[in-house]
């Protein structure tokens, strides 16, 4: 037995023209959206042919099925275009990471703080990683003080999503932008 494969094509979501079978009559809507009424399937296809467009089954489960006279290619194009616009409007939230050390100097701290503010204003989350090396592990309280200082400095821009916690040799805190 041979298995029939469709080469990546998905079936059309709506039946069109001659694909609409098994129903004697349909509820028809015209090109401009005006209701024509219940007509036989043959009359509906003739009206669509006269207009030079397609007969598209909109609601197959209705009784009788609802069909519309329209340009199906244009309909699919507009549908794809609107879906693309919706996707474009969605903002993908990213997590930006800034790395600190317990001995980060004041100027470096201010530069990294400005970057954090910029990330949060753009609507992205910020992950703050504080890495301890060597003997710095003995002074974890200095690192936690630094994370608390960052939290206090960014209080008007962000809310803490995950509070500072140690993971191996680093302390991690995640900030999310405040809702406006």
UniProtKB/Swiss-Prot annotation:
Monomer. Pfam families: IF3_C (PF00707), IF3_N (PF05198). One of its GO terms (biological process) is ribosome disassembly. IF-3 binds to the 30S ribosomal subunit and shifts the equilibrium between 70S ribosomes and their 50S and 30S subunits in favor of the free subunits, thus enhancing the availability of 30S subunits on which protein synthesis initiation begins. It comes from the Bacteria. It comes from Shewanella baltica (strain OS185). This is Translation initiation factor IF-3. SUPFAM superfamilies: Translation initiation factor IF3, C-terminal domain (SSF55200), Translation initiation factor IF3, N-terminal domain (SSF54364). Belongs to the IF-3 family. The keyword tRNA processing does not apply. Keywords: Cytoplasm, Initiation factor, Protein biosynthesis. Signal peptide: none annotated. It is found in: Cytoplasm. GO terms for molecular function: ribosome binding; translation initiation factor activity. One of its GO terms (cellular component) is cytosol.
């Amino acid at each position: 037995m041979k298995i029939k494969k469709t080469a990546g094509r998905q079936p059309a979501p709506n039946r069109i023209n001659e694909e609409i079978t098994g129903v004697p009559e349909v509820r028809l809507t015209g090109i401009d959206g005006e209701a024509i009424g219940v007509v036989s399937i043959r009359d509906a296809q003739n009206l669509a042919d006269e207009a030079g467009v397609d007969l598209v089954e909109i609601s197959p489960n209705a009784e009788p099925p609802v069909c519309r006279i329209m340009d199906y290619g244009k309909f699919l194009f507009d549908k794809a275009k609107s879906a693309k616009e919706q996707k474009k409007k969605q903002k993908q939230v990213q997590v930006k990471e800034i790395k600190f050390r317990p001995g980060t100097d004041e100027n470096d701290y201010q530069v990294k703080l400005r970057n954090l503010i910029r990330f949060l204003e753009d609507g992205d989350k910020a992950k703050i990683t504080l890495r301890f090396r060597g003997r710095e592990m003995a002074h974890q309280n200095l690192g936690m003080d630094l994370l608390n200082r960052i939290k206090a400095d960014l209080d008007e821009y962000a809310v803490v999503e995950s509070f500072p916690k140690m993971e191996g040799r680093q302390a991690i805190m995640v900030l999310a932008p405040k809702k406006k």
